[in-house]
Amino acid sequence: MGLPANDFRYTLASGRTGTLYGIRANYTLVFFNNPDCGMCERIRAEIVASPLLSEMIRAGRLEVLALYPDEDLTAWRAHAPQVPSSWINAYDAGARISKEELYDLKAIPSMYLLDRDKRVLAKDAFEVGYIEWLLDRQPQ
């Protein structure tokens, strides 16, 4: 905790790419998820239903990067409409995050909360309530 997160490149459905460090927001929530994961769907719904997270997203203080770390893009594309349009919905081309061990994804889903400078505030989180609790205690 408190250490800089590893940067990585992500790819959007359009083919455009971006980097984690290119995301400009006070906080970034990296949500590692899979299309056919029931727990991932539950967490996505909890993020959407959270008044705190929704307000922070609306105000531009929180950016959610929903990242698919695997290689079956057919499943990812079919699932894309379920991800809120206010989020960055992306995949890891070539599964570099796993192959290069940039993040130790013990389980999916997993959330990493990062501050403006991409320092890790929470890692391997799977409870939205914990993310809310942390954000509620951070300087705005």
Residue ranges and their predicted role:
Residues 41-81, 95-101:
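Structural microenvironment flanking redox-active thiols in thiol-disulfide oxidoreductases
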